[in-house]
Swiss-Prot record:
Keyword terms, alphabetized: Cell membrane, Membrane, Transmembrane, Transmembrane helix
Main localisation: membrane
Family the entry assigns: Belongs to the UPF0391 family.
TM stretches of this protein: 5-25, 33-53
Subcellular localization, as worded in the UniProt entry: Cell membrane
Species of provenance: Paracidovorax citrulli (strain AAC00-1)
UniProt keyword Transmembrane, yes or no: yes
Keyword Zinc-finger: no
A Pfam family assignment: DUF1328
Protein name stated in the entry: UPF0391 membrane protein Aave_0978
One CC-aspect GO term: plasma membrane
Lipid bilayer topology: Multi-pass membrane protein
Length: 61
């Protein structure tokens, strides 16, 4: 799950960079939503990995 947290963080950074660079005005709003969505998912996965809950246990071993 920690792998997915890192993937979500990278996707949110890329979405933010593309959305705020002036490529498209509409993409900025979508990038903001995706950034916060993936940020929340990444934080949840990191917390689960640290606590050793579910499949995150095998990642931390």
């Amino acid at each position: 799950m920690l792998k997915y947290a890192i993937i979500f963080a990278i996707i949110s950074l890329i979405a933010g960079a593309l959305g705020f660079s002036g490529v498209a005005a509409g993409a900025a709003g979508i990038a903001k939503i995706l950034f916060f969505l993936f940020l929340v998912v990444a934080v949840i996965f990191i917390v689960l990995a640290v606590l050793g809950v579910g499949a995150a246990r095998s990642v931390m071993k």
